[in-house]
Amino acid sequence: MTHTSNPDLRPRGDHYETNYGNFHTELYAGIRRDAFGNDIGQNGWLTADEQDRFLSWLNLCPGKRLLDVACGAGGPTLRIASKTGCSVLGIDAHASAISAATMLAAEEGLAGAEFQVADAARSLPFPDVTFDAITCIDAINHLPDRRLVLSEWTRLLKPSGRLLFTDPTVVTGPLTKEEIATRTYAGFYLLTTPGHNERVLRECGLRTLTTEDITHTMAESAARRKAARAAHESELRTIEGDRPYEAQQNFLAMAGRLAQERRLSRFVFAAEKPGD
């Protein structure tokens, strides 16, 4: 079973355009350092330690190719390329995110990293069996058709290729209309129930390797991000505007509370496409 909120099919532009337009400024980098302990260019709940654990499930190495869906400004994608030696292609629906990612790749001198604008809610412009691995961190919940998305990723994976995604909006307790509205203010969200992702993975012919509840990371990251932003309230209100700043702070407070109370949870899924 799935539930949707907000009729827009992608996150609202103003929030994301402002974010990506200022992503590499010292102010926003400092907020990420304060929130996560170090700045890997993350835009969701991901920590460096968590990404390292995820990488251990993907078998990436030089000569392999990764597709990172909803890559944002590219920091975590480039970190994967640097740590594993694989080539990476990051895609995102926001041109400002891809511009930021391309700039960062040039600064870091990573020749095996590419970024392009693409809408992951639709069929992707790549041939069958192109990638050894596909990742999508804290963004699949913005795509309206879970079966279409996972079928498309299955098509793109090579035999024995691996898929890893996190779903940060799994409904694991009662939610009010007001709580959902605050938690999903930034555009379209698809809320799922326990077992839904596993079922769709199976229907798409993928073998689930790992399913893990990682809600605690979201609860901790939300609290730290809210506090880090509050420490720079004056600057952020000037850049973002009063209402967007307050909406983001309310979002982080709600995300943290619902995660802490285990009512809206975050899970990671790793799966494999059968070999020939």
Roles of regions detected by a PLM:
Residues M1-A35:
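N-terminal, positively charged/glycine-rich alpha-helical extensions of SAM-dependent methyltransferases
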Residues G44-P62:
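Conserved alpha-helix/loop element of class I SAM-dependent methyltransferases that forms part
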Residues R65-V69, A73-R122:
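Class I SAM-dependent methyltransferase SAM/SAH-binding core
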Residues R122-A133:
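A short acidic, Gly/Pro-enriched loop at the edge of an enzyme's catalytic core
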Residues R147-R162:
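A short glycine-rich, Lys/Arg-flanked "PGG" loop and its adjoining helix->strand segment in the class I
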Residues P168-F188:
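Short, glycine-/aromatic-enriched active-site segment of Class I SAM-dependent methyltransferases
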Residues Y189-G205:
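Short alpha-helix
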Residues T210-D276:
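Conserved Class I S-adenosyl-L-methionine
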